[in-house]
Amino acid sequence: GFKWIANVMRENEGKARYLGGGEESYGFLAEDFVRDKDSVSAISLMAEIAAWAKDKGLNMTDMLIDIYMKYGFSREKGISLVRKGKSGAEEIIALMKQFRENPPKEIAGSPVVTVKDFQSLVETNVATGETKKLDMPATSNVLQYYTADRTKVSVRPSGTEPKIKFYIEVHDTLASADEYKATEARADEKINRIAKEFGITK
């Protein structure tokens, strides 16, 4: 969460320019004079963006599509599996062990090229077997798989609830605004396919 964003800010004070930091639960930190999630600054920025867009005859979705066309389309979905009780906790432990010891060789037809294990702080190049240490301030029970087509799947148990969480991120190109809906639908279909590959069923 934000304690780690603030930690990186402290380490880089006077060395680099801070642009912004956020987490998957929608918190955002826009300025470096606050060291925690800052809804006041974030909503002020959103209002300014909306006003700028309106002045140009656009809306915020139009602006997002322009970004996708320039930098590439990206879509992420978080899926949580609830596994309650003692048997549920044991199942979550077993799933993490299985994913750690037997990582997928491909995801949605694209070969896995990199595996990051934030518990051992080791990044593995799947093709060469070469490993390197991840530069992180602490360990965490998180696994990440990256494929050749830039798909990323992250897996971790919740620290506060009886859940195992999956974050699936896919990428595509967007040539024109007219293709946005079709690209979005294609990304959603791919995410659902990946979820099935990982055995994610409610």
Predicted regions and their residues:
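A generic beta-sheet turn/junction motif
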Residues: 159-161
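Phosphate-binding and adjacent anionic-ligand microenvironments
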Residues: 1-156, 174-180, 184-202
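Short, well-ordered beta-strand elements
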Residues: 153-155, 164-170
